């Protein structure tokens, strides 16, 4: 699942991890991304120390590692901006691809609370479009999932050829052993959740300096949104 920041990506990972037939992995390219970019993210050194920092080895694990006993579905949550240019896109061909999007004004209005000067490469929209053009796959919008969790998850499962499981609609509060080591910095809200929260329509007011970025994001979002699945 190729996602951007502030798109309910961790809640969607929770939904999949609630299935008894599914194993999940949390942002497997994060260590690679931090080691290459030097981005000063919270817990950076621990992430790099505890993760595989070579993109080829990460992709090999995703495509070749055996399934744990009793598991038949493998779900990887990715932040698409971790997909740096040096990653050979053809290495992704063996995987099924899906995309989680959010209206860029809503995304930026939320993201600016944690990073005041984001740039396009922080958001992953351009990379999402790149991967979608290469491999296709279902597109889901975070607002649609929040408004209609069960119908949207059913539609997503159907698009992926996986049977829907009602267990995806709720989960126990608290951390998981599948959460990345960075979870304590970012996952407080998810740790307190027991399901998808209600959709709250909010005014997407942006600082004037971010209006040009919102406009740059808009064509990428619109291209993906034109293919979004609905119940």
Regions found by a protein language model. Name each.
Residues 1, 5, 121, 145, ...:
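Aromatic-acidic/polar surface patches that form glycan- and anion
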Residues 1-69:
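PAPS-dependent sulfotransferase catalytic core
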Residues 69, 131-137, 220-223:
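A structural motif corresponding to the C-terminal end of an alpha-helix
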Residues 163-231:
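PAPS-dependent sulfotransferases, especially Golgi type II membrane carbohydrate sulfotransferases
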Residues 76-167, 181-192:
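PAPS-dependent sulfotransferase catalytic domain
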Residues 3, 26, 77-78, 214:
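Pocket-edge structural micro-motifs
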Residues 45-101:
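A basic- and aromatic-enriched beta-loop-alpha substructure that forms the phosphate/nucleotide-
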Residues 32-34, 107, 174:
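Generic structural signal for helix capping and beta-alpha/helix-loop junctions
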